[in-house]
Regions:
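Leucine-rich solenoid repeat scaffolds
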Residues: 243-263
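Structural signature for extended repeat/solenoid scaffolds and their inter-repeat hinge/linker regions
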Residues: 4-230, 234-238, 243-245
Length: 264
């Protein structure tokens, strides 16, 4: 039996009828209409495991039209296998200057690119969805053409310095249980429109320092039950216009010392 040596070939089909990742090729010396049977493809790692029954390892099947290199098991011409694919003068552009770029690109154009000069890693689809890791600047950037969804049980975000959230339109936050926020420094809230608050139960506020309210419009307070105001010091009420106090029931003014009503 003659010994077969490595051969150049072109992939004619990768639609393996048994779904085993094999390809059909035509070797360079074969004429039109000639082709091999279904040929297995070499991979850096392939097999199965106790958890994965098939496709454990690298699954990269050559595309139709790719140039490949055939080897032959024990040199048997009837037992070829694909050793790998080869770029040619049309399909290959190399790793650019100083061979600094390594990449993996799928048929549709999704890529993973490693740049050893810029020290970056880019994972990108054809629709501008990308993950960009910049080692020199210490940044990771995630970009999406539409949405970014994170689904998990727990999420922890730890920032040793600043955290900024910028929302172009609406912002909605829903909490099924309790919500706790602790600010060690100052807290500021600026709202360009209205603020509506609905609280089903009680509100308790403890202020260790002073509290000031400045209202440039009207102030209305509607309480269904009692209002109690207690101060351990003086209470002052000043109006620059007319003041009215009215009650639909009895009114009592009581002082431990005396009550003075004066005009002045």
């Amino acid at each position: 039996m003659p010994l077969a040596e490595t051969q150049m070939a072109t992939v004619l089909s990768n639609a393996d009828p048994q779904g085993k990742g094999r390809v059909r090729v035509r070797m360079n010396w074969q004429t039109d209409g000639m082709q091999t049977g279904w040929v297995r493809v070499m991979t850096p790692d392939g097999g199965s495991s106790s958890d994965v029954k098939s496709n454990r390892g690298f699954v990269f099947i050559p595309e139709v039209g790719d140039q490949v290199l055939l080897g032959f098991r024990h040199g048997d011409p009837a037992r070829p296998y694909v050793m790998g694919s080869l770029f040619n003068g049309v399909t290959g552009s190399g790793g650019l200057a100083a061979n600094h770029r390594k990449s993996l690109t799928t048929r549709s154009g999704s890529t993973v690119t490693f740049d050893d000069t810029a020290h970056t890693i880019l994972l990108q689809t054809t629709r501008a969805n990308k993950i960009f890791i910049d080692e020199l600047n210490g940044t990771i950037t995630i970009s999406s053409a539409e949405e970014v969804n994170v689904n998990t049980k727990n999420i922890n975000i730890n920032a040793s310095e600043n955290m900024n959230v910028n929302v172009g339109k609406n912002f909605t936050m829903q909490v099924g249980g309790d919500a706790n926020m602790t600010v060690d420094g100052n807290a500021r809230l600026s709202v360009g429109g209205d603020v509506d608050s609905t609280i089903i139960k009680n509100v308790n506020t403890v202020i260790s320092g002073d509290e000031s309210h400045t209202i440039k419009g009207k102030f209305n307070m509607d309480v269904d039950q009692n209002i109690d105001v207690c101060s351990k010091s003086k209470i002052s009420t000043l109006s620059e216009a007319e003041s009215n106090i009215s009650s639909k029931a009895n009114m009592y003014i009581k002082s431990a010392v005396r009550v003075d009503i004066a005009k002045g």
